[in-house]
Amino acid sequence: MQDQYILALDQGTTSSRAMLFDRQGNIVSIAQKEFEQIYPQPGWVEHDPQEIWSTQAGVAAEAVTRVGLNGTAIAAIGITNQRETTIVWDRETGHPIYNAIVWQDRRTADFCDKLKAQGLSEKVRAKTGLPIDSYFSATKIRWILDNVEGAREKARQGKLAFGTVDSWLVWNFTKHELHVTDVTNASRTMLFNIHTLDWDDELLDALEIPRSMLPQVRASSEIYGPTKTTVFASKIPLAGIAGDQQAALFGQMCTSSGMVKNTYGTGCFLMMNTGETPIESRNNLVTTIAWQVDGKVSYALEGSIFIAGAVVQWLRDGLGIIKSASEIEALAAGVPHTDGVYLVPAFAGLGAPHWNARARGSLFGVTRGTTSAHLARAALDSIAYQSLDVLKAMEADSGIRIGELRVDGGASANNLLMQFQADLLGVDAVRPRITETTALGAAYLAGLAIGYWQNVDELHSQWQLERRFAPSMQAEQVGSCLAGWQRAVRAAKAWADDTQ
């Protein structure tokens, strides 16, 4: 009998990817295809749902055939996806009635302000763990119902279906038979009660969204049903679903309360496992569901940083200081420190834990002696400082002292950044051998559901360290660095306040 593999589908914001994993958690094959970003007007971001499906189906087939395999070699499929992105389709035709409204889209910001003015903020946070924000799916659904001709009436008749990207993929993989999502994706809609684990009728009424549109909510690791498309000749169990950041937390094996991961991408996404009890944040973090496995729900605290790796892209594209992102480490390493220069990369405001939409990027402490190397180092340092702000908020909310930080994402390959992160935190930054942790998490969830892997203990034994960064900076020096950063953030906020 031929070896079998787990196929992980990683449907991201800019590309659809597919990876095959073997029993040791190694990547056997990978395929990727980018798709179009649609910007109808400033602040609006859309995707074509049919292109999401066609690119994802295409790379799924390519990842399998590239290594001479076919569908019979796939034991199960796990799906992970860009979260919050909203698709509404006609149940009869299977066709979307509007483009996917992407998580970054801000068109419903004014409507969110109206909901806040109605005094709904505390109710929404208590039920969903989320602040009222256009980032989440609820107001995007409402916009489609209000602005697409005939949508409201079709919804009333039960003819429309809503789904996050995972739901849309499962719907298509099962030839329109399964309309499901998992608890992690449901918890990002602003409509799901994370305590009762059900859609919340009070919130649905407040937003005038019919319950009939919503998918059935299932666990993150269970057999939802078999594929029925021509993508694969054989029927393969769809057996794992989780939003991208939750999948990364699972792929990093942060399965115990107090374990934390940071994904260093264009932005940073930090997530702390808080165990089987949701912790309501008092420090501007989001309370969310980490996963549901073996009947148990794990919760998490999450903080999002808008600009992380994007600050390196700005040095490349905006200032021309570097020709490629990979050059920044060598340039920054040319100086021992920033010489008092601080960059606050609030290009689109400040995310967690500040949540200041008006703050703008600011540079402080520049002298005639400041060089491109100092700027490069300040840019890298800003990623670590912002991450520290979120991690301190997590410690304050949870009462848990972080033992180590598990890192992944593109910028985690930067050794200078990882060392400075460890220095600031005072604990080790730990980089795994396999940094494709999002796809790995989806594979793990699917494999557990079908018995490909026996239990989480087996997965823990597979997790392998690539490098551990131990703190080496003196406490006095760390304190001085942090004091400067905090002054810079205060000044960036003051600048925004003074320009209203």
UniProtKB/Swiss-Prot annotation:
InterPro entries the UniProt entry points to: ATPase_NBD, Carb_kinase_FGGY, Carb_kinase_FGGY_CS, FGGY_C, FGGY_N, Glycerol_kin
Binding site for glycerol: R83, E84, Y135, D244, Q245
Record field: catalytic activity: glycerol + ATP = sn-glycerol 3-phosphate + ADP + H(+)
Enzyme Commission number: 2.7.1.30
Residues the entry annotates as binding sn-glycerol 3-phosphate: T13, R83, E84, Y135, D244
Keyword Nucleotide-binding attributed: yes
Any one GO MF annotation of this record: ATP binding
Enzyme type, top EC level: transferase
The keyword Nucleotide-binding appears for this protein: yes
Protein residues bound to ATP: T13, T14, S15, T266, G309, Q313, G410
Protein name: Glycerol kinase
Domain of life: Bacteria
Regulation: Inhibited by fructose 1,6-bisphosphate (FBP).
One GO cellular component term noted in the UniProt record for this chain: cytosol
Name of the encoding gene: glpK
Binding site residues for ADP: T13, R17, T266, G309, G410, N414
Cystine crosslinks: none
Family: Belongs to the FGGY kinase family.
